[in-house]
Amino acid sequence: RRVLFRSMIAVMDENGNQIHGNCKPTSELPMHTETYTIRDDIGGVVHCHPPYLTAYALANKDVETRAYPEMMGNFCKFECAPYGRPGTDKILAGAIPILQNKRDIVLLGNHGVLVVGKTVTDAMNKTEAAEAIAKALFLTAQLGGEVPLSDEECQFFLDLQKTK
């Protein structure tokens, strides 16, 4: 495992010119830059491959629950977009409608996850929360599956999410 230093982060301007960092930008830079144009409230983008969210992405499975109030109240569900080849405009194509539907977390089929927020820190915090939720749900499945809450209780948390 390598240590990430500030000098290793490729910082780009709005024209795609590198203004900081000594590492080459990712081949997925167009995905990052185009994501900012999808919604006015997007001010930060995180794309990564955390193990549990990536496992769901590799299985092309949405992450959803009827048992975990914290997920229902904060995120509703994490939808999985169809596969698109990394490094091409196809990787974002399936995620665009999900992001346009005010979802902040999108699994990229057979690849990883794309998370947006008001800032990069906000997007990173959502990424960490989403990975913890995916891990809990994955482990719950290993124990025989979740015990769902009542329809009324689920609706309470889904309504709570709509007010955020």
Residue ranges and their predicted role:
Residues 1-164:
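Glycine-rich flexible loops
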